[in-house]
């Protein structure tokens, strides 16, 4: 029986300003995968945000790391099995050939709003 990779994506709400609030909704909230699987995590914005979407990975007890910028650009040093797609309101983080070391929380965030 193969080992499983447990991934947790979570909803992160961020208010961009008082004139235009953007809500980001991720799905699924939790998933299990077997090493070698392909995994997709969806992030939907409540309004058009062009390509202003970043993805982050956070392992338990560690700081979040930046993995995808502006929806599709892989951050240097991140393995190429990670990729991002989307524009406007619908975005996807894809992990191809997932590995056990990829077990983590994943979250999307409109890039103009990272503290």
Swiss-Prot record:
It comes from the Eukaryota. Residues 70-76 are annotated as: Complementarity-determining-2. One of its GO terms (cellular component) is immunoglobulin complex. Residues 77-108 are annotated as: Framework-3. Residues 1-20 form the signal peptide. SUPFAM superfamilies: Immunoglobulin. It is found in: Secreted; Cell membrane. Residues 22-115 form the Ig-like domain. Residues 55-69 are annotated as: Framework-2. Residues 109-115 are annotated as: Complementarity-determining-3. Residues 44-54 are annotated as: Complementarity-determining-1. Residues 21-43 are annotated as: Framework-1. Keywords: Adaptive immunity, Cell membrane, Disulfide bond, Glycoprotein, Immunity, Immunoglobulin, Immunoglobulin domain, Membrane, Phosphoprotein, Secreted, Signal. This is Immunoglobulin kappa variable 5-2. The lineage of its organism: Eukaryota, Metazoa, Chordata, Craniata, Vertebrata. The gene is IGKV5-2.
């Amino acid at each position: 029986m193969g080992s499983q990779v447990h991934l947790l994506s979570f909803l992160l709400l961020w208010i961009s300003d008082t004139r235009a609030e953007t809500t980001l909704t991720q799905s699924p909230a939790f998933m299990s995968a077997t090493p070698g699987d392909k995994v997709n995590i969806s992030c939907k914005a409540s309004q058009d945000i062009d390509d202003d979407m970043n993805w982050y990975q956070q392992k338990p007890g560690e700081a979040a790391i930046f993995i995808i910028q502006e929806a599709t650009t892989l951050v240097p040093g991140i393995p190429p099995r990670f990729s991002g797609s989307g524009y406007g309101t619908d975005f996807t983080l894809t992990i191809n050939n997932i590995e056990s070391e990829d077990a983590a929380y994943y979250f999307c965030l409109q890039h103009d709003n990272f503290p």
